[in-house]
Amino acid sequence: MGLSDEEWKKVVDIWGKVEPDLPSHGQEVIIRMFQNHPETQDRFAKFKNLKTLDEMKNSEDLKKHGTTVLTALGRILKQKGHHEAEIAPLAQTHANTHKIPIKYLEFICEVIVGVIAEKHSADFGADSQEAMRKALELFRNDMASRYKELGFQG
């Protein structure tokens, strides 16, 4: 299920538009995930008590976490599928420490595509969106494989 060179170029090119403003993109991704899938918010002790959109938008911790998530994802995407070195420690912490189900990775990946589509509509057409979805599916599948190796049934 690999991506073609052309698809990877689309992924890396759009990520180049996202990177200059990771805090804003990351914050929007986390907020939208919590709004669309409220059960995900319960996994975050720091964010459990943020009840309103204003509270979420004003949380520096939430913005920092969103930045951390997208920074890690950017490193993975830039590896164009050769991301084992980045995936291994991420799977370890997400399986053993945070206990994040793969389903939640599906949720956040779809939110990421939606946020990029809104913020960069002129540069993120259907073909680029499909390439990003394929890249994110590859990431999730590799995380799921690592989870299995670690004995986590997430």
Swiss-Prot record:
Start and end residues of each Globin domain: 2-148
Keyword Transport: yes
Family, similarity comment: Belongs to the globin family.
Complex and partners: Monomeric.
Enzyme class: oxidoreductase
Keywords: Cytoplasm, Heme, Iron, Metal-binding, Muscle protein, Oxidoreductase, Oxygen transport, Transport
InterPro entries: Globin, Globin-like_sf, Myoglobin
Predominant location: cytoplasm
Name of this protein: Myoglobin
UniProt xrefs under Gene3D superfamilies: 6.10.140.2100, 6.10.140.2110
